[in-house]
Swiss-Prot record:
Stated name of the protein: tRNA uridine 5-carboxymethylaminomethyl modification enzyme MnmG
Functional description taken from the UniProt entry: NAD-binding protein involved in the addition of a carboxymethylaminomethyl (cmnm) group at the wobble position (U34) of certain tRNAs, forming tRNA-cmnm(5)s(2)U34.
Species, as recorded: Laribacter hongkongensis (strain HLHK9)
Signal peptide limits: none
SUPFAM superfamilies, A to Z: FAD/NAD(P)-binding domain
Record keywords: Cytoplasm, FAD, Flavoprotein, NAD, tRNA processing
GO cellular component terms attached to this protein's record: cytosol
Gene encoding the protein: mnmG
Similarity field: Belongs to the MnmG family.
Amino acid sequence: MIYPTEFDVIVVGGGHAGTEAALAAARMGRSTLLLTHNIETLGQMSCNPSIGGIGKGHLVKEVDALGGAMALATDMGGIQFRTLNASKGPAVRATRAQADRVRYKAAIRHMLENQPNLWLFQQAVDDLVMQGDRVAGAITQAGITFMSRTVVLTAGTFLSGKIHIGLENYTGGRAGDPAASTLGARLRDYALPVGRLKTGTPPRIDGRSIDFSVLEMQPGDDPAPVFSFRGSRDMHPQQLPCWVTHTNLRTHEIIRSGFDRSPMFTGKIEGVGPRYCPSIEDKINRFADRDSHQIFLEPEGLDTHEIYPNGVSTSLPFDIQLAALRSMKGLENAHILRPGYAIEYDYFDPRALRHTLESRRVAGLFFAGQINGTTGYEEAAAQGLLAGLNAARAARDEEGWYPGREEAYLGVLVDDLTTLGVNEPYRMFTSRAEFRLQLREDNADLRLTETGRRLGLVGDAQWDIFCRKRDAVAAERERLKSTWVNPRLVSEEDARRVLGQPVEREYSLEELLRRPGVDYATLATLPAFGGEALSGAVAEQVEIQVKYQGYIDRQHEEVARREATEHVRIPAAFDFSAVSGLSKEVQQKLALHRPETLGQASRISGVTPAAISLLHVYLKRAGAPKSE
């Protein structure tokens, strides 16, 4: 049957990409349908029970700045919070949280069920409705047809998924869930460029079988950082520690003894795994000189004994998994609740997508998450939000939006994917961003929330919080610039206590704050400080902006220089063979990738700066337009 209501946007899949996509489209006022094979697994944390980390936390903050759900759900479900790289500069500081799986999933479910314009339906999707070269809906396994203006595919690891434990394998989307094999086969019929990747997960351990008394405890930060710009510590449930153990030479010997039954070493697995989250057998093989590897024992929640051993992802046979765990300190009597496994799945080459994440071949069809070759909840959520908002805009024939590399880690992510593609699961790092000094966690709202408001993603409550912070930061910065102190106003004793030396002439408070070793809170103890000292995120932002102003200004200048060519548009039907001086190889690569701007063209492997200069001159003569 054809469902009687037509939707603006259909989202296929209810993981981290799908939930953010559906929420984004619905916040923008579009009638949105989220199709999932199981409503009970919406927002499921399929692998590790954590959110954030280096680069990843930056993405979560950006999703939050645009009105997304992940950071807020983490504050509601987080059972340990830490700031990574706390002793380093603000550009690389990152928030990471352990999450209670049940509480996190419940928070996401609550947001979905209470979002106006959003409807849920439990059925796996087997096919898409096509009208020429445009998608027009989705067909479920029961033959129900839902019509829509746009469709967002967020199938995760479910497309033609195959699970491996030792030499045994079976179809599945993840442990306990069926694969989307029919949909995977149908998508291949549409001649979309497809490949295979793999990821893995460790065995889960019953905490009652662990001897924590001999292990090193790793507590969270106190006070705990807050993830969402809309969050607070009052949202956090009870906090728990993690624990640390290590592999040893006996562990490595056991693991090597299983190589002949490993699907990775026997060729049973064809897909490429994530470089930065290798399986334990891969680590033992690649780093044969290492005597030990650190393993973090992470609690899965407040109401369960289940423990996630971070660092032991594996597809080895179960007997090897058990013996390897029991060879480690504190795990001598470990009981495995769920075996570790690897999963192979289909992904589609993201170079076949526009920067809006819309397919170049099928109009109205958007892809987000692991289906694009990424790994990680955070990367998926960021893509989901971008795909959802652009599907919503496309449903009303509005032009798409995406941030540039200089505006957001989301911009870096989508540019890397659609320009360079992937040959292994893609993970975000701060090192991928050229302009990371201005792409910090702390200013994600100042970078993106005004845009989010303009796009219809940011509601009134969030907008009010943002405006109060933005205005308070601006007012305090202006006050620090215009408040002056001199030796008559600051005693030598106070000056040495706060500044480490006397005040020898007149200075603005901003100049004093810029000095190494002087922080805002201590400066505020000077009797001459004047106004009431601010605290929390506002004080942090004021201090960072003042101390790093010179570096940030230089980065802005670098961005401005790059702008000269970055956004020069290349016409969609441009004939690269017409540009004399370009080598055949460069012409072929440009014709294959079809970059939309000179900036995108410059990041294609093998396209030289000289080739970009030639292309720029040609486009200028032809009167190529610049993008907004």
